[in-house]
């Protein structure tokens, strides 16, 4: 029987891997520059965690979660997003005792049962950050700054930042009544999904992709913000303007998760069509308390790695290619192979990527393989070389060849690679943001 990958998943290999290295390395580098520390949470959690945080009536909980009952009779869900698990870990491990604010970043797979298409998979990967313990508008600005710096580090140009404030619970109470009154007069003109949301989560009607014109004419949340939320939002806009972080206000921006309050933002890329959102987030001031902790204001964002890679490819950005083989060691005979392994180990300790033959092929076949791998140098060890305690070092770029004694081969190779501008590239590629 031949097995195939499950629908909505992909195998990542070959020419795609450098793009993943590129995006993930940049994500980590920028997060570290802002003082964030990595957090790793389980890929599955109790189902109630997501029902309580994301929202019982959201599309994620209603339609998209991978949920199962384990052998102990517990309802378990593969994580559809990373914020709730991070807050759960923060509370469970009493990280509040470490002082506030706490800054975390994560990279990992998420799972949602959606219709697979470009930029939307059932297993997808996210880079996310969470800043726990600040209600100050400066935290919102710094978070958006981090997002922008991350995208700029990928050399992306064709993106736009959209922001909105959806207020606090008090603001939204009056706003929801205004929305309900408005949509009651347009009920016959909204889609079936919106009719369901009308009863369960009326603010999500603003996010409808079918009845766009109806949503455009709906009341604006900005008219219902309390003084505190309005001041908070105005402070954010002023600081972003002062910092020359260009943004667009979008009064229909509400986000699809119930835990958001006040600031919400999305960053969209013009080349990705329907799946144009490459990064999104906002403030979730009530989530810690909702999950059994103290009332701790927090915010963050998540960015889909797959969509970022699509954006990088769409802009034809040249990315660093990770080295798989700088040096290939071709050996003939058992004793030569032992020596090849010794030399390879010496080079690897100097951070040089090396591949040695392990198939006992002919010298011609080995050199052909070295060329196919893109090696810069080939070290050749045969019976004659063993007898003289030397190797042949062939520069595959210039087709020149030199004889070098065993004791000096590592230093010779390092000097030669330095001339070619490749010394140590295996562990240093991508460190310049």
Swiss-Prot record:
EC number: 6.1.1.21
Coiled coil regions, renumbered to chain: none
Gene Ontology MF terms in the entry: ATP binding; histidine-tRNA ligase activity
Alphabetized Gene3D superfamilies for the sequence: Anticodon-binding domain, Bira Bifunctional Protein, Domain 2
Subcellular localization: Cytoplasm
One Pfam family in the UniProt entry: tRNA-synt_His
Catalyzed reaction equations: tRNA(His) + L-histidine + ATP = L-histidyl-tRNA(His) + AMP + diphosphate + H(+)
Recorded superkingdom: Bacteria
GO cellular component: cytoplasm
Similarity comment: Belongs to the class-II aminoacyl-tRNA synthetase family.
Alphabetized PANTHER family for the sequence: HISTIDINE--TRNA LIGASE, MITOCHONDRIAL-RELATED, HISTIDYL-TRNA SYNTHETASE
Protein name: Histidine--tRNA ligase
Gene: hisS
